[in-house]
Amino acid sequence: MLAAGLMLSIGAGAQTNSYTVSNIVTSAQDSRLVNPWGLSRPFNAKLTENEWWINDQVTGLSTLYDANGTGVELAVTIPPASGGGTGSPTGTAFDPTTNNFVFVTLDGTISLWNASAKPSQPGTSCAECHVTAATIMVNNAAAGASYQGVALDKNATTGVLTYYVANANGGVEAYNAESFSPITLPAGAFTDPDIPATYSPAGIQAFESFLLVTYNATAGGGTGYVDIFNTNGTLLLRLEQGFFNQPWGIAVTPANFGKFSEMILVGNTGSGLIGAYSGKGVFQGYLQSGGQDLVIPGLWGIEFGNGSTESGPTNVLYFNAGGANQTTGVFGAITAN
């Protein structure tokens, strides 16, 4: 049932497993781009502004680039929970109903960048006609929250547009996308009895009416789990175990992405490998380049373009990575050969 709902198949299996990695922007070119985690872009390619928003976890910013590496003057500061120092943005999501962007942080906040908000003295350039700082809407730092991922989808029961947030110290949480008030989920939502209690949510990605959640060991280590739920938090499927190493980024491939078309991709921060899974959750292999498994040190977010000039083709996979020690940064692209 899930495979049919996801509309995934393995029709491209006869093709060669061959992909090319290209760096678009690195921290050597832009010193703000350090250990970038999440990346997001508008859903609608017809919007006038379709750049990628990149969460720079170390520098506390969301910097904007197009698919060719051209930077945008606008950079948005993600505030820290304490009000002082530097923010720590991880996951990010775009709201197509408002054109707003949302950011979650390691120190337990959810912040909003309001696309319609104007600075007190607006100018004519991009950086001058938009506000340059996000606003904290939820601050759960005092409760020990550590937010690592966020996804936007409609709740299956209420139909309310909802932000689902992966709290490494508390499970998956839900917030009304308009008011940011917490939503009470059913008992046992987003839990898997076969995942040890020493694992907690990390990455989260929405696809149609499903939420894909990665789980990593709270003490670190080179394993992990990936589950698929409906938006009420009911467990539907667990991806085949044994091929994860701190999974975080998730993407669903289009029909023209080479050997691994119409599959689920999972990026592993620990190993830098990207694994492909069928709609039934069966492991199909890692993406390769030159006959070897493709490795991107410190890999975080992965996402396909929306077809616009700014965010790139729908069959090009864009990624963020922080390097082996998470002290550098790369925004890049992966194409099928």
Feature map (PLM): residue ranges:
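Sequence/structural signature of beta-propeller domains
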Residues: A14-N337
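Bacterial N-terminal signal peptides
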Residues: M1-S9
